[in-house]
Amino acid sequence: MRRTAFLLLTLALLTVPVCAVQIPGELLDALPEEAAALAESEGITEGGVQLLVQSFFDALRSSLDRSLRGAVLLALTVLLTGAADGFASSLGENASRFVPLVGVLCVTTLSAGDLSSLIGLGTATMQDLADLTKLLLPTMAAALAGCGGVFTASAWQVGTLFAADALTTLIHELLLPLVYCHIALASAGAALPESGLDKLADGLKKLISWLLCGAVTAFTLYLSVSGVLTGSADRAAVKAAQTAVSGAVPVVGSILAESAEMVLSAAHSLRAAIGAAGVLGVLLACLAPLVRLGVQFLLYRAAAFVSAVSGVKPLERLLEQLGDAFALVLGMTAACAVLLLAALLVSISMVVM
């Protein structure tokens, strides 16, 4: 009788309110409004897909409305420069020498606004992703620790935050200034075709690409290795703890071990909910800037094709290299988004056996 009463009393003490699937308010405040609303509902997957598709088409429509006017002006400038170059050729070599220079100055002037606004947009998006990383990763680490992944939570959070901050610093302090240097060299090389500055701009573009690819590869390898090593340590620690509790605590040891399994299951649900909300928030935060940068890159490629048809080689090279600048910023923004998504997916996949 005493054992039964003791068992019932112990079970009553273990009956406590559990809110393991409630997403922290700080994370909801950091997410876009649409993602925060979906995060509190049950159909986050279906609603998230619909929201992403709708946001994509809205961003595409808005980007075309903003960029088509500038692309048409660039195409008209290129065609007028080609016509003026053909007319100046009949007047002599001295007259035809300055026509491409005027065209380069016009294209550079027309592109200055796009370059400033879109590179600024990419920079702001990367900063928003960095801020979201500083809030989202500690939240995921706390949920991961609740799953029993104490070693994983500490190592993963500190290491991933450090790696993400290093990548953001590399982009802001080194790669973006190099992109501006690439643009300046491309413009100077188009104005002075025989100087070889355009080749230097191409070399600088390759250097930026190599640095970005190297940083992304290092971050990806870190996520892979840290997930494997720390996850193995956590699984061994949790199994040892369950065995110790089951054998050391009299009467209710096995019950406590089973309740630990239930707590871990609830923590897994929390981590999955936070991960889904975080993935949706990251995608919504970077979708519109990526679409706009991609549209701008394609329009500059189209303008370069028009320039090739018109026969003005310096303008063709300049427009191609300006398109490359948009592609570089697009790659940097996409790298930040993809690596944050990879960190979230690695965390979600760290299941304690």
Predicted feature residues:
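Gly/Ser-rich, low-complexity
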Residues: M1-P100, G113-T133, G148-L161, D165, ...
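Alpha-helical transmembrane segments of polytopic integral membrane proteins
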Residues: T77-T81, A112-I119, T139, A143, ...
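Mid-bilayer segments of alpha-helical transmembrane spans in multi-pass integral membrane proteins
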Residues: L105-D114, T133-F151, L170-I183, S187
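Extended, low-complexity, charged alpha-helical tracts
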Residues: L132-L136, A143, F305-V309, K313
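Loop-centered beta-sheet repeat module
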Residues: T160-L221
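Hydrophobic transmembrane alpha-helical segments of multi-pass transport and channel proteins
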Residues: L174, L211, A215, L270, ...
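Interfacial loop-to-transmembrane junctions
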Residues: L204, S310-G331
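Helical hairpin unit composed of two closely spaced alpha helices linked by a short loop
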Residues: A272-K313
